[in-house]
Amino acid sequence: MATVTAAKTDLDVAGLPEVADPSQVAPKDARQLTRLFFDQLSRLEEGTAEYSYARNTLIEMNMSLVRFAAGRFRSRGPEEMEDIVQVGMIGLIKAIDRFELTREVEFTSFAIPYIVGEIKRFFR
């Protein structure tokens, strides 16, 4: 399980926890942290270090969603799997940029269609 601590840097001002390795966060913890990071992301000004940290951490924490969605296209061949994951990451980034916490929808439910849609667009 990844280590989550209170940030001792400038990020502490934003109230964001420091996540040592976002890609190693357990899915149950990722759900709670994702909600916290989206809450802070909506309050932060785009272009600041805190905003970039929150956005990048969200991307890294939710990379497993991309691998999960890309698994549906495994039959396309192992050589294409890396390309599929890269295209899926674009979908994840679009989902993060468009997600609104006020809609009270789980982020995973919101992101999977974006990820799969981007992958399908890759094959057209």
Walk through the language-model features, giving the residues of each.
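Alpha-helical promoter-recognition and RNA polymerase-docking modules of transcription initiation factors
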Residues: 2-124
